[in-house]
């Protein structure tokens, strides 16, 4: 049996679409040398067969937390034969079982695990018995875990090093017991700030060089994308991807200003929809309360939310949900902590100006 060669319609300006995707990890990262070196030093013991400290990587959305974590672990895998890495999105795998299952699945250890009947402790036992390469476990969006105690479980296993990624330390610490708070506070912290416009320009220029034909976008246009993204690399790359995709579909030879004008709004809408689709069930209920009745304060939101469910989460958890949705521009908050109110995000966000 012979395989037919698959041919694709050629792009007009996109040379490598992978480079424009949000999850792409480049061979070189821009303006994060200190953070890369810090995280690498935390993980170095595992390359010598020794336990490594847990690392906590924090910063606003779009500051490169996931990218840097994956970049460092990929570099480790290239340099050391007996080190592996696995990635878990805790927003998607938000229960203790799902997270443990995902890790074991990456190890090929889930053949006889039944989602409905296998107890959690058996999954931990399997991780304790795992005798494969030492492994770095990246827990992305770790503050989304329903039971953050899993961090303690993994931390106690010397075969694994753990990277915890979250927007804010306080959102993570507020939901764990004193034992784990003490452990986390003694962990190594890698903090990432929003990018400056000049740094975003360099990140965009690197993506253009790797993914697009020459001379399809100007330096001035990259500056305007950086300005519209306001320090958020994910949004900046999203604007570039949206503009390049539209120009390519229309068989343009370059990205024109008229295409760029609408790209920011389209990219924001795509990111917002992706974030909405990622909400776990109780977060979605909280969002619906704000959509139906907002603007509302946290106590009012909680009262409405409680009427919708039989097993409501705690007030503290709902406040964490509100904080998370604000960080990801699903909701917006106005006022001080005493009189704060939440509402849907205003859709009239800045565009890429001419």
Swiss-Prot record:
Molecular function per GO: ATP binding; ATP hydrolysis activity
Q: Which InterPro entries match?
A: AAA+_ATPase, AAA_22, Cdc6_lid, ORC1/CDC6, P-loop_NTPase
The disruption phenotype is: Not essential for normal growth in a single deletion. Required together with orc2 and orc10 in a minimal orc strain.
Q: Which residues of the sequence carry a binding annotation for ATP?
A: 63-67, 195, 207
Q: GO annotations under biological process?
A: DNA replication
The answer on whether this UniProt entry bears the keyword ATP-binding reads: yes
Tell me the domain of life: Archaea
**Keywords of this protein's UniProt record, alphabetized?**
ATP-binding, DNA replication, Nucleotide-binding, Plasmid
SMART domains reported in the protein's UniProt record = AAA
Key word ATP-binding present: yes
Annotated family: Belongs to the CDC6/cdc18 family.
Q: What does this protein do?
A: Involved in regulation of DNA replication.
Supply the name of the protein. Answer: ORC1-type DNA replication protein 9
Q: Which organism is it from?
A: Halobacterium salinarum (strain ATCC 700922 / JCM 11081 / NRC-1)
What taxonomic classification does the UniProt entry list for its organism? Archaea, Methanobacteriati, Methanobacteriota, Stenosarchaea group, Halobacteria
Gene expressing this chain: orc9-1
């Amino acid at each position: 049996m012979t395989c037919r060669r698959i041919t694709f319609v050629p792009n007009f300006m996109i040379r490598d679409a992978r480079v424009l995707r949000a999850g792409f990890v480049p061979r070189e990262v821009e303006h994060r040398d200190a953070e890369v070196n810090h995280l690498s030093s935390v993980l170095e013991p595992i390359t010598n067969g020794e336990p490594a400290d847990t690392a906590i990587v924090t910063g606003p959305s779009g500051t490169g937390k996931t990218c840097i974590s994956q970049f460092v672990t990929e570099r480790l895998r290239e340099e050391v034969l007996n080190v592996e890495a696995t990635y878990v999105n805790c927003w998607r795998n938000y229960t203790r079982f799902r997270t443990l299952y995902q890790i074991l699945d990456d190890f090929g250890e889930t053949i006889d695990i039944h989602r409905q009947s296998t107890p959690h402790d058996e999954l931990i036992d399997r991780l304790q018995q795992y005798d494969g390469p030492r492994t770095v476990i990246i827990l992305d969006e770790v503050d989304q875990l329903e039971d953050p105690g899993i961090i303690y479980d993994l931390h106690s296993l010397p075969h694994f090093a753990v990277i915890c990624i979250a927007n804010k330390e306080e959102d993570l610490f507020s939901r764990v017991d004193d034992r784990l708070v003490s452990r986390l506070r003694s962990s190594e912290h890698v903090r990432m700030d929003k990018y400056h416009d000049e740094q975003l320009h360099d990140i965009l220029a690197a993506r253009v060089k790797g993914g697009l034909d020459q001379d399809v976008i100007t330096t001035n246009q990259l500056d305007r994308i950086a300005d519209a993204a306001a320090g958020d690399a994910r949004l900046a790359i999203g604007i570039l991807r949206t503009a390049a995709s539209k120009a390519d579909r229309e068989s343009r030879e370059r990205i024109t200003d008229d295409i760029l004008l609408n790209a920011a709004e389209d990219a924001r809408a795509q990111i917002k929809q992706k974030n909405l689709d990622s909400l776990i069930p109780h977060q979605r209920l909280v969002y619906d309360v704000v959509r139906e009745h907002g603007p509302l304060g946290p106590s009012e939101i909680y009262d409405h939310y409680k009427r919708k469910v039989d097993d409501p989460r705690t007030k503290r958890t709902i406040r964490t949900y509100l904080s998370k949705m604000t960080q990801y521009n699903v909701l917006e908050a106005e006022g001080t902590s005493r009189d704060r109110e939440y509402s849907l995000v205003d859709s009239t966000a800045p565009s890429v100006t001419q």
